[in-house]
Protein backbone atom coordinates (compact mmCIF):
# COMPACT_ATOMS: atom_id res chain seq x y z
CA UNK A 1 0.00 0.00 0.00
CA UNK A 2 1.21 3.49 -0.88
CA UNK A 3 2.84 5.50 1.92
CA UNK A 4 0.39 7.99 3.48
CA UNK A 5 2.61 11.04 3.02
CA UNK A 6 3.39 10.04 -0.55
CA UNK A 7 -0.35 9.73 -1.18
CA UNK A 8 -0.94 13.12 0.47
CA UNK A 9 1.61 14.75 -1.82
CA UNK A 10 0.01 13.08 -4.83
CA UNK A 11 -3.45 14.38 -3.87
CA UNK A 12 -2.11 17.89 -3.21
CA UNK A 13 -0.40 18.00 -6.58
CA UNK A 14 -3.41 16.63 -8.43
CA UNK A 15 -5.73 19.20 -6.85
CA UNK A 16 -3.34 22.04 -7.70
CA UNK A 17 -3.22 20.90 -11.33
CA UNK A 18 -6.92 20.15 -11.77
CA UNK A 19 -8.77 22.68 -9.62
CA UNK A 20 -7.99 25.24 -12.28
CA UNK A 21 -9.39 26.50 -15.54
CA UNK A 22 -13.11 25.75 -15.78
CA UNK A 23 -13.10 24.25 -12.27
CA UNK A 24 -11.36 27.15 -10.51
CA UNK A 25 -14.67 28.98 -10.03
CA UNK A 26 -16.02 26.03 -8.02
CA UNK A 27 -13.70 26.57 -5.06
CA UNK A 28 -15.60 26.67 -1.78
CA UNK A 29 -18.99 25.90 -3.34
CA UNK A 30 -21.50 23.42 -1.94
CA UNK A 31 -21.84 22.13 1.60
CA UNK A 32 -24.72 22.17 4.09
CA UNK A 33 -27.47 24.51 2.94
CA UNK A 34 -25.59 25.22 -0.29
CA UNK A 35 -25.99 21.94 -2.18
CA UNK A 36 -27.69 23.79 -5.05
CA UNK A 37 -24.60 25.83 -5.93
CA UNK A 38 -23.26 24.99 -9.42
CA UNK A 39 -24.60 21.46 -9.03
CA UNK A 40 -23.97 20.16 -12.55
CA UNK A 41 -20.53 21.76 -12.66
CA UNK A 42 -19.67 20.13 -9.33
CA UNK A 43 -20.95 16.83 -10.68
CA UNK A 44 -18.52 17.16 -13.60
CA UNK A 45 -15.76 17.88 -11.07
CA UNK A 46 -16.80 14.81 -9.07
CA UNK A 47 -16.56 12.72 -12.25
CA UNK A 48 -13.03 14.01 -12.83
CA UNK A 49 -12.14 12.91 -9.29
CA UNK A 50 -13.57 9.48 -10.08
CA UNK A 51 -11.60 9.19 -13.31
CA UNK A 52 -8.44 9.94 -11.32
CA UNK A 53 -9.24 7.23 -8.76
CA UNK A 54 -9.93 9.75 -6.00
CA UNK A 55 -13.40 8.56 -5.03
CA UNK A 56 -14.45 5.48 -3.05
CA UNK A 57 -11.03 5.39 -1.41
CA UNK A 58 -12.10 3.02 1.37
CA UNK A 59 -14.07 0.60 -0.80
CA UNK A 60 -12.37 -2.78 -1.32
CA UNK A 61 -10.49 -3.06 -4.59
CA UNK A 62 -12.68 -5.94 -5.75
CA UNK A 63 -15.63 -3.54 -5.68
CA UNK A 64 -13.90 -0.79 -7.63
CA UNK A 65 -12.40 1.13 -4.73
CA UNK A 66 -8.82 1.82 -3.70
CA UNK A 67 -8.83 -0.24 -0.50
CA UNK A 68 -6.98 2.53 1.32
CA UNK A 69 -6.60 2.88 5.07
CA UNK A 70 -8.28 5.35 7.38
CA UNK A 71 -5.05 7.38 7.49
CA UNK A 72 -5.07 7.72 3.69
CA UNK A 73 -8.68 8.86 3.67
CA UNK A 74 -8.03 11.41 6.42
CA UNK A 75 -5.10 12.75 4.40
CA UNK A 76 -7.34 13.09 1.35
CA UNK A 77 -9.99 15.07 3.25
CA UNK A 78 -7.35 17.34 4.77
CA UNK A 79 -5.82 18.14 1.40
CA UNK A 80 -9.25 18.52 -0.19
CA UNK A 81 -10.22 21.11 2.42
CA UNK A 82 -6.85 22.85 2.19
CA UNK A 83 -7.39 23.29 -1.55
CA UNK A 84 -10.88 24.74 -0.87
CA UNK A 85 -12.25 22.15 -3.29
CA UNK A 86 -16.04 22.08 -3.88
CA UNK A 87 -18.35 19.80 -1.94
CA UNK A 88 -18.90 16.48 -3.69
CA UNK A 89 -22.37 15.69 -5.03
CA UNK A 90 -22.61 11.94 -4.44
CA UNK A 91 -22.24 11.65 -0.66
CA UNK A 92 -25.30 9.41 -0.29
CA UNK A 93 -24.06 6.99 -2.92
CA UNK A 94 -20.35 6.90 -2.15
CA UNK A 95 -20.40 7.18 1.64
CA UNK A 96 -23.72 5.55 2.58
CA UNK A 97 -25.28 3.24 0.00
CA UNK A 98 -22.02 1.97 -1.48
CA UNK A 99 -20.68 0.58 1.81
CA UNK A 100 -24.16 -0.80 2.58
CA UNK A 101 -24.28 -2.71 -0.70
CA UNK A 102 -20.75 -4.00 -0.11
CA UNK A 103 -21.83 -5.29 3.32
CA UNK A 104 -25.37 -6.53 2.58
CA UNK A 105 -26.02 -6.46 -1.18
CA UNK A 106 -26.21 -9.41 -3.52
CA UNK A 107 -23.49 -9.86 -6.16
CA UNK A 108 -26.04 -8.79 -8.77
CA UNK A 109 -26.85 -5.59 -6.86
CA UNK A 110 -23.18 -4.83 -6.40
CA UNK A 111 -22.43 -5.29 -10.11
CA UNK A 112 -25.45 -3.21 -11.10
CA UNK A 113 -25.03 -0.20 -8.81
CA UNK A 114 -21.48 0.16 -7.47
CA UNK A 115 -19.80 1.13 -10.78
CA UNK A 116 -22.44 3.82 -11.41
CA UNK A 117 -22.00 5.20 -7.90
CA UNK A 118 -18.23 5.26 -8.28
CA UNK A 119 -18.38 6.98 -11.68
CA UNK A 120 -21.07 9.47 -10.51
CA UNK A 121 -23.41 8.48 -13.35
CA UNK A 122 -26.27 7.76 -10.93
CA UNK A 123 -27.06 9.88 -7.87
CA UNK A 124 -28.89 8.64 -4.78
CA UNK A 125 -30.98 10.09 -1.97
CA UNK A 126 -32.08 8.65 1.37
CA UNK A 127 -35.76 7.79 1.95
CA UNK A 128 -36.00 7.43 5.72
CA UNK A 129 -37.87 10.28 7.43
CA UNK A 130 -41.65 10.65 7.19
CA UNK A 131 -44.13 13.20 8.54
CA UNK A 132 -44.79 10.85 11.48
CA UNK A 133 -41.38 9.20 11.63
CA UNK A 134 -38.50 11.62 11.94
CA UNK A 135 -36.25 11.08 14.93
CA UNK A 136 -38.52 8.14 15.82
CA UNK A 137 -37.65 6.31 12.62
CA UNK A 138 -39.20 3.01 13.74
CA UNK A 139 -42.65 4.56 13.20
CA UNK A 140 -42.23 4.27 9.40
CA UNK A 141 -45.64 3.95 7.70
CA UNK A 142 -44.66 3.75 4.02
CA UNK A 143 -45.68 0.31 2.76
CA UNK A 144 -44.43 -2.02 0.05
CA UNK A 145 -46.32 -5.11 -1.12
CA UNK A 146 -45.14 -7.78 -3.53
CA UNK A 147 -47.06 -7.93 -6.78
CA UNK A 148 -45.54 -10.68 -8.87
CA UNK A 149 -41.92 -9.74 -9.50
CA UNK A 150 -42.22 -6.16 -8.20
CA UNK A 151 -42.74 -4.25 -4.98
CA UNK A 152 -45.61 -1.73 -5.03
CA UNK A 153 -44.79 1.21 -2.76
CA UNK A 154 -47.19 3.71 -1.18
CA UNK A 155 -46.46 6.45 1.31
CA UNK A 156 -44.57 9.68 1.84
CA UNK A 157 -41.03 10.61 2.74
CA UNK A 158 -39.98 14.09 3.84
CA UNK A 159 -36.79 16.12 4.30
CA UNK A 160 -35.26 14.03 1.52
CA UNK A 161 -32.05 15.82 0.57
CA UNK A 162 -31.44 16.27 -3.17
CA UNK A 163 -34.28 13.97 -4.25
CA UNK A 164 -35.05 16.39 -7.09
CA UNK A 165 -31.55 15.85 -8.47
CA UNK A 166 -31.29 12.09 -7.86
CA UNK A 167 -32.13 9.10 -10.02
CA UNK A 168 -32.56 6.56 -7.21
CA UNK A 169 -33.62 6.45 -3.56
CA UNK A 170 -32.90 3.83 -0.89
CA UNK A 171 -36.22 3.55 0.92
CA UNK A 172 -37.12 2.09 4.31
CA UNK A 173 -40.64 0.65 3.95
CA UNK A 174 -42.96 -1.66 5.90
CA UNK A 175 -43.34 -4.91 3.96
CA UNK A 176 -45.14 -7.05 6.55
CA UNK A 177 -48.76 -6.18 7.26
CA UNK A 178 -49.54 -5.63 10.92
CA UNK A 179 -45.87 -5.30 11.90
CA UNK A 180 -44.82 -2.60 14.32
CA UNK A 181 -41.71 -0.65 15.18
CA UNK A 182 -38.47 -2.30 14.05
CA UNK A 183 -40.04 -5.51 12.78
CA UNK A 184 -41.33 -6.03 9.24
CA UNK A 185 -39.27 -3.29 7.56
CA UNK A 186 -37.33 -3.73 4.33
CA UNK A 187 -34.62 -1.71 2.60
CA UNK A 188 -35.60 -1.12 -1.02
CA UNK A 189 -33.81 0.47 -3.98
CA UNK A 190 -36.36 2.55 -5.88
CA UNK A 191 -36.01 4.39 -9.23
CA UNK A 192 -37.40 7.93 -9.02
CA UNK A 193 -38.08 8.54 -12.70
CA UNK A 194 -41.48 6.82 -12.89
CA UNK A 195 -45.15 7.88 -12.87
CA UNK A 196 -45.74 6.72 -9.29
CA UNK A 197 -43.21 9.11 -7.76
CA UNK A 198 -43.84 12.82 -7.16
CA UNK A 199 -41.13 15.08 -5.74
CA UNK A 200 -41.89 18.48 -4.21
CA UNK A 201 -39.00 20.72 -3.10
CA UNK A 202 -39.40 22.39 0.31
CA UNK A 203 -38.35 26.04 0.41
CA UNK A 204 -36.35 26.59 3.60
CA UNK A 205 -35.85 29.63 5.79
CA UNK A 206 -32.59 30.22 3.89
CA UNK A 207 -34.57 30.63 0.66
CA UNK A 208 -33.03 27.50 -0.89
CA UNK A 209 -34.69 24.12 -1.45
CA UNK A 210 -32.33 21.18 -0.97
CA UNK A 211 -34.94 19.17 0.96
CA UNK A 212 -37.99 17.54 -0.61
CA UNK A 213 -41.22 15.72 0.02
CA UNK A 214 -41.37 12.46 -1.95
CA UNK A 215 -44.75 10.82 -2.58
CA UNK A 216 -45.04 7.16 -3.63
CA UNK A 217 -48.38 6.31 -5.26
CA UNK A 218 -48.19 2.71 -6.48
CA UNK A 219 -44.54 3.26 -7.33
CA UNK A 220 -42.71 0.11 -8.34
CA UNK A 221 -39.32 -1.49 -8.04
CA UNK A 222 -38.07 -4.97 -8.87
CA UNK A 223 -38.52 -7.68 -6.26
CA UNK A 224 -34.79 -8.42 -6.21
CA UNK A 225 -33.94 -4.81 -5.28
CA UNK A 226 -34.31 -5.40 -1.55
CA UNK A 227 -31.00 -5.11 0.31
CA UNK A 228 -30.64 -7.82 2.91
CA UNK A 229 -33.54 -10.11 3.67
CA UNK A 230 -37.14 -8.83 3.49
CA UNK A 231 -38.13 -7.81 7.01
CA UNK A 232 -34.52 -7.14 8.03
CA UNK A 233 -34.53 -3.53 6.85
CA UNK A 234 -34.02 -2.00 10.28
CA UNK A 235 -30.65 -3.69 10.71
CA UNK A 236 -29.54 -2.65 7.23
CA UNK A 237 -30.79 0.93 7.72
CA UNK A 238 -28.93 1.27 11.02
CA UNK A 239 -25.76 -0.04 9.38
CA UNK A 240 -26.12 2.66 6.73
CA UNK A 241 -26.28 5.31 9.44
CA UNK A 242 -23.05 4.03 11.01
CA UNK A 243 -21.24 4.75 7.76
CA UNK A 244 -21.99 8.46 8.34
CA UNK A 245 -19.54 8.48 11.24
CA UNK A 246 -15.80 7.95 11.09
CA UNK A 247 -14.00 9.33 8.06
CA UNK A 248 -17.20 10.86 6.68
CA UNK A 249 -17.72 12.71 9.96
CA UNK A 250 -14.09 13.76 9.96
CA UNK A 251 -14.50 15.15 6.46
CA UNK A 252 -17.46 17.15 7.71
CA UNK A 253 -15.32 18.54 10.52
CA UNK A 254 -12.67 19.64 8.05
CA UNK A 255 -15.35 21.72 6.33
CA UNK A 256 -16.23 23.15 9.74
CA UNK A 257 -12.58 24.03 10.28
CA UNK A 258 -12.64 26.03 7.05
CA UNK A 259 -15.76 27.86 8.23
CA UNK A 260 -14.12 28.66 11.57
CA UNK A 261 -10.96 29.90 9.87
CA UNK A 262 -13.02 32.20 7.65
CA UNK A 263 -14.93 33.46 10.69
CA UNK A 264 -11.68 34.25 12.53
CA UNK A 265 -10.54 36.25 9.51
CA UNK A 266 -13.88 38.09 9.45
CA UNK A 267 -13.54 38.90 13.16
CA UNK A 268 -10.12 40.40 12.53
CA UNK A 269 -11.32 42.39 9.53
CA UNK A 270 -14.35 43.84 11.33
CA UNK A 271 -12.43 44.42 14.60
CA UNK A 272 -14.85 42.09 16.41
CA UNK A 273 -11.74 40.21 17.57
CA UNK A 274 -10.91 43.22 19.76
CA UNK A 275 -13.76 42.11 22.02
CA UNK A 276 -12.33 39.67 24.63
CA UNK A 277 -15.64 37.78 24.80
CA UNK A 278 -15.58 37.17 21.05
CA UNK A 279 -11.95 36.02 21.28
CA UNK A 280 -12.86 33.61 24.07
CA UNK A 281 -15.76 32.14 22.05
CA UNK A 282 -13.56 31.74 18.98
CA UNK A 283 -11.01 29.95 21.15
CA UNK A 284 -13.69 27.67 22.59
CA UNK A 285 -14.87 26.91 19.05
CA UNK A 286 -11.33 25.89 18.11
CA UNK A 287 -10.90 23.64 21.15
CA UNK A 288 -14.33 22.10 20.53
CA UNK A 289 -13.34 21.30 16.96
CA UNK A 290 -10.12 19.64 18.14
CA UNK A 291 -12.10 17.59 20.65
CA UNK A 292 -14.46 16.39 17.90
CA UNK A 293 -11.49 15.44 15.74
CA UNK A 294 -9.92 13.45 18.56
CA UNK A 295 -13.21 11.68 19.22
CA UNK A 296 -13.69 10.81 15.55
CA UNK A 297 -10.16 9.43 15.28
CA UNK A 298 -10.60 7.43 18.49
CA UNK A 299 -13.80 5.80 17.24
CA UNK A 300 -12.21 4.97 13.87
CA UNK A 301 -9.10 3.47 15.45
CA UNK A 302 -10.98 1.67 18.24
CA UNK A 303 -12.51 -1.82 18.29
CA UNK A 304 -13.90 -3.15 15.02
CA UNK A 305 -17.26 -3.66 16.73
CA UNK A 306 -18.98 -0.33 17.23
CA UNK A 307 -19.54 0.63 20.85
CA UNK A 308 -23.09 1.63 21.89
CA UNK A 309 -23.69 5.35 21.87
CA UNK A 310 -20.77 6.36 19.64
CA UNK A 311 -22.94 7.71 16.86
CA UNK A 312 -25.21 9.51 19.31
CA UNK A 313 -22.33 11.26 21.08
CA UNK A 314 -20.86 12.26 17.72
CA UNK A 315 -24.18 13.73 16.57
CA UNK A 316 -24.54 15.76 19.78
CA UNK A 317 -21.00 17.08 19.49
CA UNK A 318 -21.15 18.32 15.91
CA UNK A 319 -24.76 19.55 16.02
CA UNK A 320 -24.19 21.72 19.08
CA UNK A 321 -20.82 22.95 17.83
CA UNK A 322 -22.10 23.97 14.40
CA UNK A 323 -25.22 25.64 15.76
CA UNK A 324 -23.06 27.62 18.19
CA UNK A 325 -20.80 28.64 15.30
CA UNK A 326 -23.79 30.09 13.47
CA UNK A 327 -24.72 32.12 16.54
CA UNK A 328 -21.13 33.27 16.98
CA UNK A 329 -21.01 34.39 13.35
CA UNK A 330 -24.00 36.67 13.89
CA UNK A 331 -22.38 38.17 16.97
CA UNK A 332 -19.16 38.78 15.04
CA UNK A 333 -21.14 40.60 12.32
CA UNK A 334 -23.26 42.53 14.81
CA UNK A 335 -26.24 44.63 13.75
CA UNK A 336 -25.52 44.52 9.99
CA UNK A 337 -26.10 40.78 10.10
CA UNK A 338 -29.72 41.37 11.08
CA UNK A 339 -30.46 44.22 8.70
CA UNK A 340 -28.50 43.67 5.49
CA UNK A 341 -29.69 40.55 3.62
CA UNK A 342 -28.07 39.65 0.29
CA UNK A 343 -25.09 41.80 1.11
CA UNK A 344 -21.53 41.42 2.34
CA UNK A 345 -22.51 39.02 5.11
CA UNK A 346 -24.98 36.85 3.18
CA UNK A 347 -22.84 33.72 3.62
CA UNK A 348 -22.89 34.05 7.40
CA UNK A 349 -26.59 34.88 7.59
CA UNK A 350 -27.33 31.73 5.60
CA UNK A 351 -25.05 29.69 7.88
CA UNK A 352 -26.87 30.98 10.95
CA UNK A 353 -30.30 30.14 9.52
CA UNK A 354 -29.27 26.68 8.32
CA UNK A 355 -27.56 25.67 11.56
CA UNK A 356 -30.77 26.22 13.52
CA UNK A 357 -31.77 22.79 12.19
CA UNK A 358 -28.52 21.02 13.10
CA UNK A 359 -29.85 19.91 16.48
CA UNK A 360 -33.04 18.55 14.85
CA UNK A 361 -32.29 16.71 11.60
CA UNK A 362 -30.50 13.36 11.68
CA UNK A 363 -32.06 12.66 15.07
CA UNK A 364 -32.83 15.51 17.47
CA UNK A 365 -30.67 16.24 20.51
CA UNK A 366 -33.48 15.01 22.74
CA UNK A 367 -33.61 11.65 20.98
CA UNK A 368 -29.81 11.30 21.10
CA UNK A 369 -29.73 11.98 24.84
CA UNK A 370 -32.55 9.51 25.48
CA UNK A 371 -30.69 6.80 23.57
CA UNK A 372 -27.47 7.45 25.49
CA UNK A 373 -29.33 7.50 28.80
CA UNK A 374 -31.34 4.34 28.21
CA UNK A 375 -29.07 2.13 26.08
CA UNK A 376 -25.63 3.15 27.34
CA UNK A 377 -26.12 4.32 30.91
CA UNK A 378 -29.01 1.95 31.68
CA UNK A 379 -31.29 4.68 33.04
CA UNK A 380 -35.08 4.20 33.13
CA UNK A 381 -37.01 4.94 29.94
CA UNK A 382 -38.49 8.40 29.54
CA UNK A 383 -41.97 8.64 31.03
CA UNK A 384 -44.70 8.87 28.38
CA UNK A 385 -48.15 10.43 28.54
Curated annotation (Swiss-Prot):
Biological pathway: Steroid metabolism; cholesterol degradation
Positions annotated as active site in the UniProt record: 244
Names of required cofactors: FAD
Cofactor: how bound: Binds 2 FAD per heterotetramer.
GO biological process: cholesterol catabolic process
Pfam families: Acyl-CoA_dh_1, Acyl-CoA_dh_M, Acyl-CoA_dh_N
Annotated transmembrane regions: none
Originating species: Mycobacterium tuberculosis (strain ATCC 25618 / H37Rv)
The UniProt record lists the keyword Hydrolase: no
Protein name as catalogued: Acyl-CoA dehydrogenase IpdE1
Binding site residues for FAD: 126-129, 161, 364-366
Reaction it catalyzes: 3-[(3aS,4S,5R,7aS)-5-hydroxy-7a-methyl-1-oxo-octahydro-1H-inden-4-yl]propanoyl-CoA + A = (2E)-3-[(3aS,4S,5R,7aS)-5-hydroxy-7a-methyl-1-oxo-octahydro-1H-inden-4-yl]prop-2-enoyl-CoA + AH2
Amino acid sequence: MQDVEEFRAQVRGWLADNLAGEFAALKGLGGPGREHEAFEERRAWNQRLAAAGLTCLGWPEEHGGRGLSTAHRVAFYEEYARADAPDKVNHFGEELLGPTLIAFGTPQQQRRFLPRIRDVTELWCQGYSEPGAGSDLASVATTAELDGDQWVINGQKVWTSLAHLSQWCFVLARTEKGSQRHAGLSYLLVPLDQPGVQIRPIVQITGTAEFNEVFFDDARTDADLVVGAPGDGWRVAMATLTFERGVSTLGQQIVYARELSNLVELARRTAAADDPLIRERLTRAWTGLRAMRSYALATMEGPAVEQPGQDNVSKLLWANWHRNLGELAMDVIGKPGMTMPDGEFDEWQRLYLFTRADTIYGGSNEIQRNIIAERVLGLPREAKG
